[in-house]
Amino acid sequence: LSNRVRLYESSPVEELNKIGSDWQAKTPKGLVTASKVILAVNGNIENFGYFQNSLLHIYTYGSITQKLTPDQIKILGGKKEWGITPADPLGTTVRRISGIGGDRIVIRNRFTYNPNMNPNRSILDNVLRSHVKSFSDRFPMLKDIKLSKTWGGHLTLSRNNVAAFGELKPGLYSACCQNGLGTVKGTLHG
């Protein structure tokens, strides 16, 4: 990082106020003042009072198998690493990965709408059951493999497919809601 940048981790902003020509962010442990602020907080931009009722809070879910045994790798065959990624952000992704963590398969194919941005354990349990079925349908020859981890992640979509991006007020910018294509669209938007 540049010597002109200070990094404050685990410092949630509780308030953001315009003080003169600067912006002041209040955290549980203090205040940070800056002339310019970029809110890169995805769907949490609504908690700052912007883009109210224009964003959809979706969670997508993935699961990863346990390490494949040498026999399972032989049964699966093919290349050690491959992936199928959909053009639709909510489509199914399947990847075979290899590395320090062993040979595994990752599947992602479920989503839920969570306007409160807080999915619960029963949702994750339902997703796991769905992933187990999807995995066994796609890889019937690997019926003994278990899914070792299942997780979810927040994906913000806008109602009009436009990013929540730009200058909100003098010195206050938003870089939020990339509609499922964060790396690509975030780079394009600067």
Predicted features along the sequence, with ranges:
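Beta-strand residues in well-ordered beta-sheet regions across diverse protein folds
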Residues: 26, 108, 175-176
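Hydrophobic/aromatic beta-strand patches that form the interior of the parallel beta-sheet core
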Residues: 8, 38, 173-175
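A conserved FAD-binding loop/helix module that cradles the flavin
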Residues: 117-124, 173-189
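Helical element adjacent to the flavin cofactor pocket in flavoenzyme catalytic cores
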Residues: 1-35
